[in-house]
Amino acid sequence: AYRIDHVLGFFRIWEIPVHSVHGLLGQFAPALAMSREEIESYGLHFQEDRFTRPFITDWVLDRMFHERAGEVKEKYLDRLDEERYQMKPEVDTQRKVEALFADVADEKELWLRDGLYALISDVLFVRDHTNPGVFHPRISAQLDFIYESLYDNDKAAFNRLYNDYFYRRNNQFWYQEAMKKLP
């Protein structure tokens, strides 16, 4: 016996990139990605580099890693600009971090690994897997530091965009796609 929670689940799948360990950087397929213009129509000035690159700053590192923030900067990060850091190339994906910590059993080191995973997924938007010129809001982005860093009016604009994307725009699209396939 099968239980069907929602019929639209048959017409979409959550795709997780091969470079990810966790699903936060995934996207539905098929899905209607958003252009820069569509994002900005919600009142959110789209800063592509800031919103699609992991949001790593001194205050983020201090809050996440506490007394180990300096160690994280030295071992795993390069300076990107005056405000931000970026992951070193050898740890710039969750899979690379996973491989680096593959033989580690120490709880403190696993905590560090999990923090690095979280840094990598701290983005507001993910690029579409097939068309990198369009974007999807990152699922649950409101729980991350990039969202916290936004002004209140930008948070409100992102929330409108997010709710429309996940609860209207794509539901209608999936319904229309389902109607083409169902008798």
Predicted regions and their residues:
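Catalytic cores of glycan-processing enzymes that make or break glycosidic bonds
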Residues: 1-183
